[in-house]
């Protein structure tokens, strides 16, 4: 192994200070401080010399003292479920854009759908003195946050409500979107419709199941217990659930997939079947319009959810004190082909 760094004269750990800038520019420390902090009282020529010294030395302001003086860090934390999930990319970008518009830095992390990991991340962000938090909760008990909220950390929940505390929340219309999906399948002649969803402890999974059952009941259709499967979105589990529904003596003729991970596995399973089976998925996903048939989905608006949540957060940071807000963002059914397949003849 060759050590390519051997013999280099570069030194680490010697960041330039305001004292170095002052010496290079030939001014006092107070003058450098005024320039760095954008304060008045410095002539244009002096400001130019200080800025040239800052550029030459690569000086960066240390915000620690300023934070201690002002009590605000100009940073917010975002705790997501899974950074790799396509639903969270637009949400993350929207929160970041609003934060940038307010001069704030966004720090994010993933809970991996683990309540203990969520709490660990949230408290770590609080320890770093973020001004506020946007949380997609993995757990259902957020009383651990009460001391932080009391201490002034603004908090908004997204996609799922907080558990056992009152807080601002931004949700999709999960119930209404699920109703629309199932009603769409019923309108195309389906009577035996299976639902495969996420773990029942998750708010969105419960709401989508409720929408499924409500739509079936509204059409006067029974729901066989064998047509409903909630649990992990692991592909093996989803495949087993779909296969059981499709191979039953009275097989389902359509599937309603509770999120995009379930939908992707369902597409693979249905592609192996000899007869076409209708499919509607909750959540749009990349390439959904390119497979054949293209996938009919209930599309959420994660970017709007992120903007709304960040707007509520900065509203709190601006000092607005009123009861917690609950904002519900509508969904949209996009018919592309898979949800319009009629039931196969028995």
PLM features per residue range, with description:
Residues 20, 26, 36, 58, ...:
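Conserved functional loop/turn residues at catalytic and ligand-binding sites
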Residues 1-74, 343:
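N-terminal helix-turn-helix DNA-binding module of bacterial transcription factors
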Residues 1-11, 56, 97-102, 150-157, ...:
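Bacterial carbohydrate/catabolite-sensing allosteric modules
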Residues 65, 119-122, 145, 182, ...:
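Short hydrophobic/charged patches on amphipathic alpha-helices used for structural packing
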Residues 24, 29-34, 68-84, 184, ...:
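Short beta-strand segments enriched in small/hydrophobic residues
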Residues 132-145, 157-166:
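Acidic, Gly/Pro-rich loop/turn segments at junctions of secondary structure
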Residues 112-115, 136-141, 260-261:
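Short beta->alpha connector loops
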Residues 59-124, 128-132, 210-213, 217:
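Amphipathic helical "hinge" segments at domain boundaries
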């Amino acid at each position: 192994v060759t050590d390519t760094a051997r013999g280099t004269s570069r030194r680490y750990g010697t960041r330039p200070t305001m004292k170095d800038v002052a010496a290079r520019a030939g001014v006092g420390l107070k003058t450098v401080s005024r320039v760095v902090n954008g304060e008045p009282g410095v002539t244009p020529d002096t400001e130019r010399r200080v800025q040239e010294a800052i550029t030459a030395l690569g000086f960066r302001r240390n915000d620690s003292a300023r934070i201690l003086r002002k009590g605000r860090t100009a940073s917010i934390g975002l705790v997501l479920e899974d950074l790799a999930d396509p639903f969270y990319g637009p949400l993350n970008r929207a929160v970041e854009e609003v934060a940038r518009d307010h001069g704030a830095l966004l720090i994010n992390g993933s809970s991996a759908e683990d309540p203990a990991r969520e709490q660990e991340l949230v408290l770590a962000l609080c320890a770093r003195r973020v001004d506020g938090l946007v949380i997609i909760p993995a757990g259902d008990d957020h009383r651990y946050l009460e001391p932080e909220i009391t201490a002034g950390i603004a908090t908004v929940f997204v996609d799922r409500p907080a558990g056992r505390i009152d807080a601002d929340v931004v949700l999709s219309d999960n119930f209404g979107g699920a109703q629309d999906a199932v009603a769409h399948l019923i309108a195309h002649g389906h009577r035996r419709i299976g639902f495969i969803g996420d773990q029942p402890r998750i708010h969105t999974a419960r709401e989508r199941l409720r929408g499924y059952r409500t739509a079936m009941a509204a059409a006067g259709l029974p729901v066989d217990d064998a047509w409903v499967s909630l649990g992990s979105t692991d592909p093996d589990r989803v495949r087993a659930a779909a296969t059981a529904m499709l191979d039953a003596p009275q097989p389902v003729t359509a599937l309603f997939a509770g999120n995009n991970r379930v939908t992707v596995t369902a597409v693979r399973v249905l592609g192996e079947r000899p007869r076409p089976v209708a499919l509607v998925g909750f959540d749009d996903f990349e390439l959904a319009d390119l497979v054949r048939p293209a996938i009919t989905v209930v599309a959420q608006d994660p970017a709007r959810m992120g903007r709304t949540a960040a707007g509520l957060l900065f509203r709190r940071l601006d000092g607005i004190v009123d009861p917690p807000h609950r904002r519900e963002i509508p969904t949209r059914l996009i018919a592309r082909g898979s949800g319009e397949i009629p039931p196969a003849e028995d």
